[in-house]
C-alpha cells in the first residue's frame, strides 16, 4: 500500500512563536516529525509551510517542501493546496501528520493509512483510551464516541459519553467508555478537495474542531484504537521542555 504523508508546518503560533523550528537536541522539531513520517513507510513525505526559514531547515535535512499560502484557516486547507500543486489523483491516500508531534510513533501513521485504504469512508483517524478523570474533564482533550462499526458519532471537548449514574454519585472516577481523539487523519485526495469546498459548520465553529465539518455534511469518519499511544504534542514552552527531557 502506498501513501503520501503531508506535514502542515505553520510558522506563526500564538503560544510558541516559530514552533516548527524550535530546537530539540540539535534538530528543528519539524525535522523530527519528518523523520518519524519517513520511518512509517510513506512513499513520499512533504512538509507544507508558509515560511521560508522552515523550508530551508527541511531542505537542509534532505526533506521535501511545498511552499503554501499564509492565510489558510486549517491544516486541511493547507493540504488541499499541496495536493493540487502536485496534482495527486483523487484516489491517492494522504495522511495528515501534525507538525508539532516529534515523538509520534511511525506505526500509527501507517495504521491510519491502511484504515482509509481499506474502507469506503471519507476520513480515518485514531483514538486512545482515557485513563484519568482529569483527562476526561479536560476541554483540551478531545473525546470521541463511536458506533458499532467504529465510525465517529461525535467529537467534543465536553465529557462524552456522560455516565449519568456514575457521575450522579461521584465524578472522582471514570469507566472504560472514554476515548481521546488523536489528531492524525487519513483521506483520499479527492475527499480533501471536496472538504475545502464546504462551508464551515456551526458545530465546528462552536467546538473549534474541524473534523466536525465532515460529520455535519453526512460523511463518515472511521476511528480505530491506536496501536501505540503517542506522547502529547508541543503547544507551549512547558510542553517543549517535557519533550526534550523525554527524547534524551
From Swiss-Prot:
It is an enzyme of class 2 (transferase). It holds the Pfam family CTP_transf_3. One of its GO terms (biological process) is CMP-keto-3-deoxy-D-manno-octulosonic acid biosynthetic process. GO terms for cellular component: cytosol. It catalyses: 3-deoxy-alpha-D-manno-oct-2-ulosonate + CTP = CMP-3-deoxy-beta-D-manno-octulosonate + diphosphate. Pathway: Nucleotide-sugar biosynthesis; CMP-3-deoxy-D-manno-octulosonate biosynthesis; CMP-3-deoxy-D-manno-octulosonate from 3-deoxy-D-manno-octulosonate and CTP: step 1/1; Bacterial outer membrane biogenesis; lipopolysaccharide biosynthesis. Keywords: Cytoplasm, Lipopolysaccharide biosynthesis, Nucleotidyltransferase, Transferase. Its EC number is 2.7.7.38. Belongs to the KdsB family. Activates KDO (a required 8-carbon sugar) for incorporation into bacterial lipopolysaccharide in Gram-negative bacteria. This is 3-deoxy-manno-octulosonate cytidylyltransferase. The lineage of its organism: Bacteria, Pseudomonadati, Pseudomonadota, Gammaproteobacteria, Enterobacterales. The gene is kdsB.
